Amino acid sequence: MARDVANVWWAMFGFSVVVLLVVSALWIYAMLRRPRTHTAEEAKRINRRWIIGGGLILPTVTIIALLAFGIPTGRGMLPLPVEGEQPLRIQVIGHQWWWEVRYPESGVVTANQFILPVDRPVDVEVTSADVIHSFWVPRLGGKLDMVPGRTNTLRVQASQSGIFRGQCSEFCGSQHAHMILHVEALEADAFASWIETRRELQHQPPSGDAGRVFAERCGQCHRVTGVSEGNRAPDLSDLATRPTLGAGVIANDADGLRRWLSDHQSLKHGNAMPRHDDIPEETLGQLADWLETLAP
């Protein structure tokens, strides 16, 4: 679908270049030519010719050409009935400044990553939990606004496996630029395996002080299957498999995880997670070690 959108763009670009060249050539011709004297009848005929050609024929041809390219492309992004395998539903909810991604058919929930199968249409149902966001993965197709209290649907389809970048394309606050979505298209078997491993995830809570801190603070907002049921912040059940933290702010490795826990406000100022200045570094380290185990 992204290829179709690109084709429309290139067609519009090519036509715009032609118009620019024609207008420039006419302007140069008008500047250089010698003025001629026309009778009233000749002047009227010339004006009529420009009105018909430039005011009627050219716009009509242009609009017909754009519609011929644009309507089929736009139709492909609508959630219309299809023959064969039915579209997969994926719900994406925008938050300041992270992505909640749900697979209602399997009950899988993740955050800041959008995994989809290759060669199968996907209906992306988007909405927002706070302000207006916009779902946009350039390599997959068009963009669609995420409006609080309203669900919009965009159909996308990946033609090959790979990793792509998604981005919120509607200004949504101070960290708008740091609202990145990791998108990965998997072959059908790999996608089915990905869903199955997430559906079966069950974790054990951390021990000692780390367990107490997680239960008293983290678990009130974050969900970890088998441990906590918080629903106000990103689901952490498969945190260790994600390439970044904070929706693209920092790499998800041992050092990045510790930096995020101890100083996340300097990394992504204004995010909703409170500071942990009163928690000893040793306890934060234990908590980070446990978070690194959250994977299938």
Language model: regions and residue ranges:
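Axial heme c-ligation environment in periplasmic c-type cytochrome domains
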Residues: 176-179, 229-239, 260-294
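Extracytoplasmic entry segments of secretory-pathway proteins
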Residues: 1-118, 199, 296
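Sequence/structural segment immediately N-terminal to covalent heme-attachment motifs in c-type
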Residues: 203-224, 236
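Inter-heme linker and motif-flanking segments adjacent to c-type heme-binding CXXCH motifs
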Residues: 174, 178, 203, 220, ...
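Short Fe-S-cluster ligation motifs
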Residues: 198-209, 248-262
